[in-house]
UniProtKB/Swiss-Prot annotation:
Belongs to the UbiA prenyltransferase family. Protoheme IX farnesyltransferase subfamily. Converts heme B (protoheme IX) to heme O by substitution of the vinyl group on carbon 2 of heme B porphyrin ring with a hydroxyethyl farnesyl side group. HAMAP family: CyoE_CtaB. Its EC number is 2.5.1.141. InterPro entries: Protohaem_IX_farnesylTrfase (IPR006369), UbiA_prenyltransferase (IPR000537), UbiA_prenylTrfase_CS (IPR030470), UbiA_sf (IPR044878). Pfam families: UbiA. This is Protoheme IX farnesyltransferase. The gene is ctaB. GO terms for biological process: heme O biosynthetic process. The keyword Amino-acid biosynthesis does not apply. It is found in: Cell inner membrane. The chain crosses the membrane at residues 29-49, 51-71, 102-122, 123-143, 151-171, 179-199, 219-239, 241-261, 280-300. Pathway: Porphyrin-containing compound metabolism; heme O biosynthesis; heme O from protoheme: step 1/1.
Length: 318
């Protein structure tokens, strides 16, 4: 982290203050984290999630993610200042000072831990806190600026919300919880490397050793291809041998996975084509959201009743 010579700018209204602090949390990232939490919770609760517990866990997860992203903004303010697309963020533009942002981040973390401890359980709260610590110390401080494997290892932080959701429901972590964690972990490289292919020049400008910058596009798309295949296979392990999800989820996972593989295959053969990389990046977001939605739908008692009714009718016909 390098200090930047940014003059302090004052907000013209209280609304602008709120907007600046809201932007610090990188709110567009958070919904994707929450959907993995939801998918995990519904499977753990066998489709019958306590609405209050769901609300509390989502709120606690949001606060934890917001805290981690705020600290990330503090740490990365130097490189954000050097990139045109990020120069106008609250930290590099001088709208929010380091001390104020740090107090904000700590307050969010404390609120998250307290909320989850009181209304869920200590395991869920501890996992959320560990996610903040891992993201800040391992990814932001250590890996991001020093290793091409930054988002691979750092992807563990983004996968922790799935564990938080499971722990909030059961108070334990089963093999299914760890598999959902692994699915998100394995999905992260194709997702972020596709983005890195799109903005490779920005990363090169500020010296971030993303894989496309160091190894080139051809090597990157090969890694994307391998991780995509492994991710799709991993999603099916929830059906067999773990039996945590059923036929509805299996159909959704196979359909989504087929498209994911096809788009990754196209990028493998067009490593320099940014529109193809963008297409994969955008689809990877939809893929994870719809996959988790499939977990939710499959876990619902109504879904089970409908499947059983169809099976019984087929037996009668045969």
């Amino acid at each position: 982290m390098i200090e930047t010579n940014v003059s302090r700018r004052h907000h013209e209204s209280f609304l602008q203050v709120i907007q600046s602090y809201y932007q610090l949390t990188k709110p567009r990232i958070i919904p994707l984290l929450l959907i993995t939490t939801a998918g995990s919770m519904w499977i753990a609760a066998q489709g019958q999630v306590d609405p209050v517990l769901l609300l509390v866990t989502m709120a606690g997860g949001t606060l934890a993610a917001a805290s981690a992203q705020t600290i990330n903004c503090i740490y990365d303010r130097d490189i954000d200042y050097d990139m045109e697309r990020t120069r106008h963020r609250p930290m590099p533009s001088g709208k929010v000072q380091v001390r104020d942002a740090l107090i904000f981040a700590i307050a969010l973390a404390v609120l998250s831990f307290t909320l989850l401890t009181v209304f869920a359980n200590l395991l869920a709260a501890s996992l959320a806190l560990s996610g903040i610590i891992f993201y800040v110390l391992i990814y932001t401080h250590w890996l991001k600026r020093h290793s091409t494997q930054n988002i691979v290892i750092g992807g563990a932080a983004g996968a922790i919300p799935a564990l938080v959701g499971w722990a909030a429901v059961t108070g334990t972590l089963s093999w299914s919880a760890w598999l959902i964690f692994a699915i998100v972990f394995l999905w992260t490289p194709p997702h972020f490397w596709a983005l890195a292919l799109m903005i490779r020049d920005d990363y090169a400008k500020v010296g971030i050793p993303m894989l496309p910058v160091v190894e080139g596009n051809a090597a990157t798309v090969k890694q994307i291809w391998y991780y995509t295949l492994i991710t799709v296979v991993a999603t099916l392990l929830l059906v067999y041998p773990l039996h945590s999800s059923g036929i509805v989820y299996a159909a959704i996972a196979i359909s989504l996975g087929a498209v994911f593989i096809r788009k990754s295959w196209r990028l493998l053969h067009n490593p320099e084509d940014r529109p193809t990389a963008r297409e994969l990046f955008l689809y990877s977001i939809s893929y994870m959201m719809l996959l988790c939605l499939g977990m939710v739908i499959d876990s619902l008692p109504l879904t089970h009743h409908l499947i059983n009714a169809v099976i019984n009718q087929l037996h009668l016909i045969s």
